[in-house]
């Protein structure tokens, strides 16, 4: 609980600067003496940096920065301001979680990682960008922070599971935790994107097999190739467990440039995460729904590139799910899986937490896309991934801590303003006419 109290400050939120001027205001506040140096300790530092909105970058900006005269000094100057802002914004929201959730060892551990990373970044706020040693040490720090945060997602997930097992879940808490985790994990994806870009571009350990990548971005990401890779790896798991697997039927249509391969500027690992998760779900449903028949319908994938959207539709005949359960598939608090142990980052990611679909949807939404499920109970499910076709429109979707966010945690959610149907029909014979 000490960490929770440490991070809790006042509840008032100052007006946030517009994105274009956020960095300038941050720099000028620091120079004028109203910056974090004049604040006391971690709470003051968090309060100061949380006053500013994160600056969302487009895929084109990521690409242009990394491909045209990539400058480590420029990256240093941007990240030493932007990373504390992103960390502080979400740290303010962590402190608004229920006390019993904040007391769990796993959430305490996550908080300690964020505090340590913020403090390490602030060590560079007054250092010269002209000093080669400073730039080298900063890159080292970025890599260290990235590695420290490897297990943030499963560790926070374990904290939620610990809380649910000890205290149960009421509708209001469930709604607030769902709201928080969507924002927390989206923030984590965005922070990791910045850390990865800097460390891959300037850390000197880029993969030789990915020489055409700009950091983690492939300017010509072959969508079909990533889909096939995800299918093959999911199929291996399916074969191990069920000793069989459904075939893949894949169709592609490039409506934008007919006859050309479907390629977009994207992060292949993000797309892989989404399709791998969807393939696993589709295969499991298909194998179990048709177990008594011994014949397994193929999984059909349609890939279409239009002027605005790249769309991937995956269709299975795994029996589908009822409409009332669709939203639960994206609910972090709903998973009934037994609690797994978080031991090392080499373990199967998120195994047993039931977080595959909600995290996949966040990856899709991160650059203004989406992931949706459409199910026909008794027949099968269509999963559709939407990705922006233009790199200028693929812009980071970032949470910001402001009055609206604060009110969401502090407002008592009122009862629904629609009638709740009773489980049994009313006995109309009990009503007498006067």
From Swiss-Prot:
InterPro entries: AK/P_DHK_N_sf (IPR036784), BCDHK/PDK_N (IPR018955), BCKD/PDK (IPR039028), HATPase_C_sf (IPR036890), His_kinase_dom (IPR005467)
Phosphotyrosine, modified sites: 136, 241-242
Residues bound to ATP: 277-284, 316, 335-336, 352-357
Residue(s) carrying N6-succinyllysine: 403
Subcellular location: Mitochondrion matrix
Assembly notes: Homodimer, and heterodimer with PDK2. Interacts with the pyruvate dehydrogenase complex subunit DLAT, and is part of the multimeric pyruvate dehydrogenase complex that contains multiple copies of pyruvate dehydrogenase (E1), dihydrolipoamide acetyltransferase (DLAT, E2) and lipoamide dehydrogenase (DLD, E3). Interacts with phosphoglycerate kinase PGK1; the interaction is direct, occurs under hypoxic conditions and leads to PDK1-mediated inhibition of pyruvate dehydrogenase complex activity.
Task performed by this protein: Kinase that plays a key role in regulation of glucose and fatty acid metabolism and homeostasis via phosphorylation of the pyruvate dehydrogenase subunits PDHA1 and PDHA2. This inhibits pyruvate dehydrogenase activity, and thereby regulates metabolite flux through the tricarboxylic acid cycle, down-regulates aerobic respiration and inhibits the formation of acetyl-coenzyme A from pyruvate. Plays an important role in cellular responses to hypoxia and is important for cell proliferation under hypoxia.
Entry protein name: [Pyruvate dehydrogenase (acetyl-transferring)] kinase isozyme 1, mitochondrial
Organism: Rattus norvegicus (Rat)
Designated gene of the protein: Pdk1
């Amino acid at each position: 609980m000490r960490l929770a109290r440490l991070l809790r400050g006042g509840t008032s939120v100052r007006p946030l600067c517009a994105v274009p001027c956020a960095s300038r205001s941050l720099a000028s506040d620091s120079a004028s003496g109203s910056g974090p140096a004049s604040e006391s300790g971690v709470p003051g530092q968090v309060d100061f940096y949380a006053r500013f909105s994160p600056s969302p970058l487009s895929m084109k900006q990521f690409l242009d920065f990394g491909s045209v005269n990539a400058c480590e000094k420029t990256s240093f100057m941007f990240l030493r301001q932007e990373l504390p802002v992103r960390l502080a914004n979400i740290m303010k929201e962590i402190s608004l979680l229920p006390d019993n959730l904040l007391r769990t060892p796993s959430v305490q551990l996550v908080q300690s990682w964020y505090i340590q990373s913020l403090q390490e970044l602030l060590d560079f706020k007054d250092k010269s960008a002209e000093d080669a040693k400073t730039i080298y040490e900063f890159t080292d720090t970025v890599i260290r922070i990235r590695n420290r945060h490897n297990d943030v997602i499963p560790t926070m997930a374990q904290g939620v599971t610990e809380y649910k097992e000890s205290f149960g879940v009421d509708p209001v808490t469930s709604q607030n935790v769902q709201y928080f985790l969507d924002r927390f994990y989206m923030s984590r994806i965005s922070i990791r994107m910045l850390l990865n870009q800097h460390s891959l571009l300037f850390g000197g350990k880029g993969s030789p097999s990915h020489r055409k990548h700009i950091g983690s971005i492939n300017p010509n990401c072959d969508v079909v190739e990533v889909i096939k890779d995800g299918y093959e790896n999911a199929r291996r798991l399916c074969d191990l467990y069920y000793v069989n697997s459904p075939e893949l039927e894949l169709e592609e249509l490039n409506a934008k440039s007919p006859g050309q391969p479907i390629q977009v500027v994207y992060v292949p690992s993000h797309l892989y995460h989404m399709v791998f998760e969807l393939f696993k779900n589709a295969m499991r449903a298909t194998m179990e729904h048709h177990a008594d028949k011994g014949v397994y319908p193929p999984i059909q994938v349609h890939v279409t590139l239009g002027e605005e959207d790249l769309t991937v539709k995956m269709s299975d005949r795994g029996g589908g799910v009822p409409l009332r359960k669709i939203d639960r598939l994206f609910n972090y608090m709903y998973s009934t899986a037994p609690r797994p142990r978080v031991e090392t980052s080499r373990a199967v990611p998120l195994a047993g937490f039931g977080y595959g679909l909600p995290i996949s949807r966040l990856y899709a939404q991160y650059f203004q896309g989406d992931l949706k499920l459409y199910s026909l109970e008794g027949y099968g499910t269509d999963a559709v991934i939407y990705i922006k076709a233009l790199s200028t429109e693929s812009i980071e979707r970032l949470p910001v801590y402001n009055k609206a966010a604060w009110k969401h945690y502090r407002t008592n959610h009122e009862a629904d303003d629609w009638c709740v149907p009773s489980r049994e029909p009313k006995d109309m014979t009990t009503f007498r006419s006067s």
